[in-house]
């Protein structure tokens, strides 16, 4: 039986469809009748699989069913085109018979079965380490069908050339060339590889061990298997600022480029593995620096993304006559990226890849989400899949949208929009991020520069929204009074969600792109409001809570590396010659202030943050292993409030208990309704999501339905405030005024 996923009015395909449809035919007619064909482009698409309908036949509101196309895009780029010249080692990439540099990118396209019922908008979701995601749906893909109900066409494609394609097209990748010297000899350079917490008894480790994100990367192989030409050492201790202790060199005769899992040391030679004669010690971190060969020209992935998106947006067919399945039906493209893939969106815009080879804009709208840095992909021997660990580039380039000087690092004044301004191809940008981006992903310089002395102004085409008290990507939501600690971390898991606010802001971005309707004002912590401070207990005003560890300067710092004279810092391009790099200085970073509960102030608080059940943290503490006591990677913590005043006093907790805050369950329900109504009025929450959250809170059993006389009075006061807000309309709509 056909499943129907009902539309709740969260996105309206119809209200944008007529306007977009009127533009679609005109755009295609003008382009294909009058434009000169691009020299560099997608030349062929191959559809390997078509599933029609997809999603098990589910229908989505007025849009109906969807279908899916899985395939490959064959493309070529002109290495001499100014738009491609910035790609590192493009001149060392092999050429095809046309003198171009070729690539093959996988893609997945999902579209309404009847495109006339869609909204004519392509939502391009940048894959994260090759993995497809569904950013705005609750419950996966299709989950609650949020974007499908809106009529969006969805596209994912490969951009990261060191990701292996998994069976059954489980992910996306791109085949890019290997750089070679003009005489055919291998291009070489230094590479660093670091690993820790290897189980006792381990003798062999693979350099293709899945990095964060769970993908299998391509290994940069050593030029020589002679271990005297590499340096392996182990560290007994290491700080986040690269201060090491107990550094012990591993003799060259005590390890091998080999696999010892079957044959004992020195094992079977293998350039992708390291064998240690006496085995790895889990109490040490190991670091190897070696001369590698055959770097991938990973910057080609930027051009491939640009070209694939442009093909589906503009082309009617490929050079072989294969039809574009969405030809003449798309008028707008919005790009979204989460974390690493959001960083890639920033890199694309910064390096000029939001202009295609015909001078057209690629993304009219962009939502870099929880993306504090840029993606390290356009330099020799880059490793794009890293995760802001020590010695990994990512915060070296321009991190701010507006032109701004970087006096601390001695860099030229620049901004991420410089190139797109020159070509009139800047998108409308809604940047969204949460607390962990400050604490663990080095967000601060993007707001206040490297000297941390001034708020950097935002350009007119950029809005910025901060989600206080959230973990990386947001928590599971709901209204829990206790959670389970994440793996490897000390504190309970932070449930504070981001998805509800993200959905509302995605609608605002869509309206901005399609209708020109201004989004709400930017909302994020600023210096001039006193909401950004040094990460110390005193500066933040952080309370003393029993069982809650807090150390001053606990954040993952921004380090100023000396990567060598051939590295182009502002563009994070070029060649690294120093591995490991010298740390020249530690950049001042700031974090948000907190209130007496330890909850962050400013930004766009979720409903849960406005009706808190505890302290929601953007950081957590590593529970064990080599990094015990340091920040637990990309993970926020949660410290619940005591349920009653008696419990609070017994535990010496200075934070008011749930009963003291809300009185009864009715009081809590009123607090949630008050927060939800205000967020809807401010366009920070969709009515459909408010209608979901309010009964969810009512069913949460946070408190008893009745209490003491004092509890009942507290609840009655909260409910009277809610009624008062309804009568007086205290929550004004925020239409923004930054244009």
Name every feature range the model reports, one short phrase each.
Residues 1-18:
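N-terminal secretory signal peptides that target proteins for export/translocation
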Residues 13-29:
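Sec-dependent N-terminal signal peptides
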Residues 29-38:
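C-terminal segment of classical bacterial N-terminal signal peptides
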Residues 41-739:
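C-terminal His-loop and adjacent cap/lid subdomain of alpha/beta-hydrolase
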């Amino acid at each position: 039986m056909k499943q129907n996923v009902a539309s709740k009015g969260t996105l309206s395909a119809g209200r944008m469809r007529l306007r977009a449809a009127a533009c679609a035919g005109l755009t295609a007619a003008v382009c294909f009748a009058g434009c000169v064909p691009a020299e560099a482009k997608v030349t062929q698409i191959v559809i390997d699989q078509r599933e029609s309908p997809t999603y098990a036949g589910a229908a989505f509101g007025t849009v109906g069913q969807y279908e899916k196309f899985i395939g490959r895009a064959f493309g070529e780029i002109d290495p001499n085109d100014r738009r491609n010249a910035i790609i590192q080692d493009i001149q060392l990439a092999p050429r095809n018979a046309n003198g171009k540099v070729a690539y093959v990118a996988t893609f997945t396209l999902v579209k309404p079965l009847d495109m006339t019922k869609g909204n004519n908008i392509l939502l391009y979701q940048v894959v994260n380490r090759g993995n497809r995601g569904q950013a705005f749906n609750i419950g996966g893909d299709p989950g609650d069908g949020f974007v499908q109900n809106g009529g969006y066409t969805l596209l994912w494609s490969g951009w990261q050339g060191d990701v292996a394609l998994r069976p059954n097209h489980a992910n996306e990748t791109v085949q890019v060339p290997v750089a070679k010297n003009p005489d055919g000899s291998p291009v070489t350079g230094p590479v660093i590889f670091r690993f820790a917490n290897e189980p006792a008894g381990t003798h062999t480790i693979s350099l293709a061990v899945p990095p964060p994100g769970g993908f299998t990367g391509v290994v940069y192989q050593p030029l020589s298997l002679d271990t005297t030409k590499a340096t392996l050492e182990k560290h007994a201790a290491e700080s986040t600022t690269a201060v090491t202790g107990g550094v012990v060199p591993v003799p060259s005769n005590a390890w091998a480029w080999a696999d010892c899992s079957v044959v004992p040391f020195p094992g079977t030679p293998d350039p992708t593995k390291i064998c240690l004669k006496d085995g790895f010690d889990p109490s040490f971190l190991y670091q190897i620096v070696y001369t590698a060969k055959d770097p991938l020209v990973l910057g080609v992935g930027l051009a491939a993304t640009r070209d694939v998106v442009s093909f589906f947006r503009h082309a009617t067919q490929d050079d072989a006559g294969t039809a574009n399945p969405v030809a003449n039906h798309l008028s707008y493209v919005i790009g979204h990226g989460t974390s690493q893939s959001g960083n890639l969106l920033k890199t694309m815009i910064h390096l000029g890849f939001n202009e295609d080879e015909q001078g057209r804009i690629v993304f009219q709208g962009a939502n870099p989400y929880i993306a504090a840095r840029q993606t390290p992909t356009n330099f020799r021997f880059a490793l794009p899949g890293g995760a802001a660990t020590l010695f990994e580039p990512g915060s070296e380039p321009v991190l701010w949208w507006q032109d701004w000087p970087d006096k601390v690092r001695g860099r030229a004044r620049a901004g991420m929009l410089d190139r797109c301004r020159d070509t009139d191809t800047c998108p409308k940008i809604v940047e969204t991020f949460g607390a962990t981006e400050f604490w663990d992903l080095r967000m601060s310089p993007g707001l206040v520069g490297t000297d941390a002395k001034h708020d950097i102004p935002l350009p007119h085409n950029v809005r910025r929204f901060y989600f206080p008290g959230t973990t990386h990507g947001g928590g599971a939501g709901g209204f829990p009074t206790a959670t389970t600690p994440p793996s490897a971390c000390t504190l309970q898991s932070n449930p504070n969600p981001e998805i509800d606010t993200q959905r509302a802001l995605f609608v605002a971005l869509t309206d901005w792109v399609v209708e020109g309707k201004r989004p709400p004002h930017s909302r994020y912590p600023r210096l001039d409001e006193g909401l950004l401070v040094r990460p110390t207990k005193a500066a933040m005003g952080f309370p003393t809570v029993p069982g809650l560890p807090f150390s001053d300067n606990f954040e993952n710092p921004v380090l100023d590396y000396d990567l060598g004279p051939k590295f182009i810092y502002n563009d994070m391009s070029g060649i690294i010659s120093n591995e490991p790099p010298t740390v020249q200085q530690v950049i001042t970073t700031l974090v948000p202030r907190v209130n007496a509960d330890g909850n962050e102030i400013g930004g766009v608080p979720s409903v849960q943050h406005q009706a808190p059940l505890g302290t929601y943290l953007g950081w957590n503490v590593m529970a064990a292993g080599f990094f015990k006591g340091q920040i637990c990677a990309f993970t926020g913590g949660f410290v619940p409030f005591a349920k009653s005043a008696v419990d609070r006093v017994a535990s010496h907790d200075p934070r008011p208990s749930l009963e003291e805050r809300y009185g009864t369950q009715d009081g809590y329900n009123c607090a949630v309704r008050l927060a939800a109504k205000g967020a809807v009025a401010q366009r920070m929450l969709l009515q459909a999501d408010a209608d979901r959250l309010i009964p969810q809170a009512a069913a949460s059993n946070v408190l008893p339905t009745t209490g003491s006389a004092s509890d009942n009075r507290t609840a009655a006061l909260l409910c009277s405030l809610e009624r008062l807000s309804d009568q007086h309309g205290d929550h004004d709509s925020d239409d923004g005024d930054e244009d």
